[in-house]
Structures are given as structure tokens and as C-alpha cells.
Amino acid sequence: MSTPLRFIPEEAKRWTNKAGEPIAVVEVTIRTLLGIYLLKPTDRNRSLILGVLGRAQERIGFELYGYAYLSNHGSLLVGVRDSVELARLMEYIHGNIARELGRKEQSNWAGRFWGRRGRPILVLTDEDLVGRMRYLLANSTKEGLVVHPARWPGAHCARALCEGRADHGVWVDRTKLRSLRAGASQKRSVAEADATTHYRVRLDKLPCWAGLSDAQYQQLIREMCHDIRQQAALERKNTQRTVLGRKRLLRMSPHHRPDQVDRSPAPAVHCIDQAFRQWFIEAYRSFVAGYRAACKRLCVLVHQCDIPPGGVPPFATVAAHPL
């Protein structure tokens, strides 16, 4: 199945950001190639992921409600103004995480990092917002990896939200680092810290809970995490399973490939309102039809240009294999 097109209709912008601009809330998920543990939750990987998130926030300006990166997949809950902003943040975050964590000193992975492009799924109601936040927080605990969401050693928003503080990460400017090392004398060594910037990851309140005080919001998240912990403990008791734990997690190779990877299909949209859900599905189908027609018209215009022979004209593959 091909990756769905990014589509955010005006009707999906049901909330506003701090500037009063209409926004849509999107859950973004992504998985490593073959489910390999390239996102191993070391302190260094955690810091690098948080640095990418913090820098992306500063450059793009989207709202971030939650994040959770396990050993082989990551999830974000974000508020965006349109599809262009969504595309920018996905490209920036996923591209830079792959470049940093694929380096020799992290996972020594030179090939393709992600199994597919990130999957954005719109969230359309307040109830769905709370449900997706709970699901994101449960990552790591529901899999039996740790006993509480805040115990996950990797990049996870639970601890920051429960303790009412912000996470911080680092961004290494590789271009600056190479330049410094190229111009350094033999007597002076250049450290990575000379090209490192620290970033704060700002977490926003869910739009449906934006009117709560900081203390009230923190208490709701704590209660949610406590409930997740109790539910996971009951599940372990019924199945006689044990928690994997931090030490065993960190002993695993970043090249470890699990025996099974969840292949369940992603929903088209998160919406408990069946009428609204059906409206969105029909609107998406109409959008795809219009998008395909526009691509065909653009292809015709491109082929009318005087393109030198010997290469592949832009949109030639679209004409041969329509979306």
C-alpha cells in the first residue's frame, strides 16, 4: 500500500495555537528499517534526538504536545498550521535523527535508516486528543519494557510532563566542526563541544486542556501515567511476563532485529465521531482525485518545455505510473 498523501483540510483545524492561529493536531509515527534497534535508548541517542526536536521547534515554530522514541520506532503529537508545515517538520526531524544516529559512533549504520516515510494521522476530536496522548505516554510501558512511562531511558515526554520541567538536548553542527578541525593547528585539538548547541524542548498543553493551570495539567498527566502503570502491571500478572528493564535494554546491539514487528495497518484518521470520520474519508478521496489530475496537467506542461534529450524529464515517472 502506498503512503497516503498529506492532507489537512480547513475543517480539521479545530483548535488554535498560542498566537490564535487555527491548527490541526497530527500524530506522526515512524519505524526503523526492519524494526532494527537503531534508536537504542542510550543517553547519547536521547540527547541527540531531543536536540533535533528542540532545533526543529525553534526553526519551524510548531506546537509539540508529546514525543516517545523507543528502540525501533518513534511517535510525535504535534499542532501544525497546514500540510506544508507538517511536511517541513517531518523532513527535518526524521532526516536529522537518521543522520545523527546512523553515525559510526552511535549505531554504525550506513544504509537506509527508516523503513518508510513517516505516517501522519489527523486527530479530529477532543476525546481522540486525550486518547492519542495516553497511547503515546504508554509507549515503553505497554510493551513491558519498563514499569512506568517516566522510567524509559530514551527520549520520552513522560518524565518532563510529570515533573513539570523541560527536556534538553544537543545539536552538533557538523559543517562547523569540520571547518574548525580543518583550520586548527596541530597544537590545538578541536572537540565536538566546540560546535555543539544546547536546545530546550518546549512541551505545549493539549489544545483541549489549554485552559488548565500548569499544576492541573501536570496532575492529569500524572494520573494518566499512574493508570498506565497499573494497567500494565495487571497485564503482566495475567500473562506471567516480566519487565525487560533498563540494563537488559542497553545490552542489546543497535543492529538487533526483533523476531516480530507490528504490521497492523494505520487508521486513516483518529475520530470517534463516525459522521465526521466518514466526511473526512470522502474529502480525502476527492483531494486525491484532484491531486492526480493536477499532476497530469503539470506533466503535460513540463513535456511542452524544450528539455534536452538523454535524461528523464520531471514527472515522467508520474505519467508512466500515476499515483
Model-derived features with residue positions:
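Short catalytic/metal-binding and nucleic-acid-binding patches
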Residues: 1-323
